[in-house]
From Swiss-Prot:
PANTHER family linked: 30S RIBOSOMAL PROTEIN S14, SMALL RIBOSOMAL SUBUNIT PROTEIN US14M
Alphabetical keyword list: Ribonucleoprotein, Ribosomal protein, RNA-binding, rRNA-binding
GO MF term list: rRNA binding; structural constituent of ribosome
GO biological process: translation
Protein name: Small ribosomal subunit protein uS14
Reported function: Binds 16S rRNA, required for the assembly of 30S particles and may also be responsible for determining the conformation of the 16S rRNA at the A site.
The keyword Cytoplasm is annotated on this UniProt entry: no
Assembly with partners or alone: Part of the 30S ribosomal subunit. Contacts proteins S3 and S10.
Sequence similarity: Belongs to the universal ribosomal protein uS14 family.
Top-rank taxon: Bacteria
GO CC terms in record: cytoplasm; small ribosomal subunit
Length: 101
């Protein structure tokens, strides 16, 4: 199990990223638009830099829903390889069977 503080910190980052997503996207669009004047683009880039660091989606780490483990994460199942193996062998994941050949 991951530290509870690390999992909670990641949840706060997710919430902050959602809260600022629209504002961040709008400012990024202005910065990348070549038709907008250079001065306005510069103002937008400064405003973008003034946003909280944790409001960027890049700062959010994918974590296992079961254990909170940050590594060996399967996006499709939203869990780590270890939790997948345990739950799969117990038969809690539909369609997952032990392989034999």
């Amino acid at each position: 199990m991951a530290k509870v503080s690390a999992v909670e910190k990641n949840k706060r980052r997710e919430m902050m990223a959602k809260r600022y997503a629209a504002r961040r996207a709008r400012l990024k669009a202005i910065v990348m638009d070549q038709k907008v004047s250079l001065e306005e683009r510069f103002k937008a880039s400064i405003q973008l830099a003034e946003l909280p660091r944790n409001s960027a989606r890049v700062r959010v780490r994918n974590r296992c829903e079961v254990t909170g483990r940050p590594r060996a994460y399967y996006r499709k199942l939203q869990m780590s390889r270890i939790a997948l193996r345990e739950l799969g062998s117990l038969g809690h994941i539909p369609g997952v069977v032990k392989s034999s050949w």
